[in-house]
Curated annotation (Swiss-Prot):
Residues given in the record as substrate binding sites: T57, G73, A74, A75
Organism whose genome encodes this protein: Frankia alni (strain DSM 45986 / CECT 9034 / ACN14a)
Family, per entry: Belongs to the PanD family.
EC number: 4.1.1.11
GO annotation, cellular component aspect: cytosol
One Gene Ontology MF term: aspartate 1-decarboxylase activity
Post-translational modification as stated in the protein's UniProt record: Is synthesized initially as an inactive proenzyme, which is activated by self-cleavage at a specific serine bond to produce a beta-subunit with a hydroxyl group at its C-terminus and an alpha-subunit with a pyruvoyl group at its N-terminus.
Keyword Cytoplasm: yes
Region: Disordered, residue numbers: 118-170
Name of the protein: Aspartate 1-decarboxylase
Bound cofactor: record note: Binds 1 pyruvoyl group covalently per subunit.
Assembly, per entry: Heterooctamer of four alpha and four beta subunits.
Length: 170
């Protein structure tokens, strides 16, 4: 059996351009592609944080160091310049590889410069007390309640019930 696993995530990138008349794809700064281990032509999912749109396309390399995140073709009707997006890539692997696999997670600033690197897909934004770990966002969790009240959430993880145990990659 093959499993589809997260291989890379560029978190909260800012869309710098959208061109309806360009032939498909998403243009991504070549430095970001390399740091995320994405190849030109690789399938990616784009999730627009501003409006909830979700689409699939393929990556093409933009000029290195430019910070470009360009939405091209029909997707430009769904995602606009200035929108925050998450760019996600998945890969298929057998069970043994999937259990060992560690994804690449990049955090970028408003100019799409890398401000953090990691391997934990649930990790909160670095130095952002308003962001919440994805695995702690469960009903009844005091950290979730604190986040909704605007209280800083970067604190020791709350013990999860056995049914919610998270196992770190080896």
């Amino acid at each position: 059996m093959l499993r589809t696993m997260l291989t890379a995530k560029i978190h909260r990138a800012t869309v710098t351009q959208a061109d309806l008349h360009y032939v498909g794809s998403v243009t991504i700064d070549a430095d970001l592609l390399e740091a995320a281990d994405l190849l030109p032509g690789e399938q990616v999912t784009i999730v627009d944080i501003n409006n909830g749109a979700r689409l699939e396309t393929y990556a093409i390399a933009g000029p290195a160091g430019s910070g470009v995140i360009g939405i091209n073709g029909a997707a430009a009707r769904l995602v606009q310049p200035g929108d925050l997006v998450i760019i996600i890539a998945y890969g298929m692997m057998d069970d043994a590889e999937a259990r060992r696999h560690v994804p690449r997670v990049l955090f970028v600033d408003a100019e799409n410069r890398i401000i953090g690197r990691g391997h934990d897909p649930a990790e909160a934004l670095p130095d952002d007390p308003s962001s919440l770990r994805g695995d702690l966002a469960v009903p009844g969790n005091p950290v979730t309640a604190a986040a909704r009240r605007g209280t800083p959430t970067h604190q020791a993880p709350v013990a999860l019930p056995a049914s919610r145990t998270v196992v770190a990659p080896r």
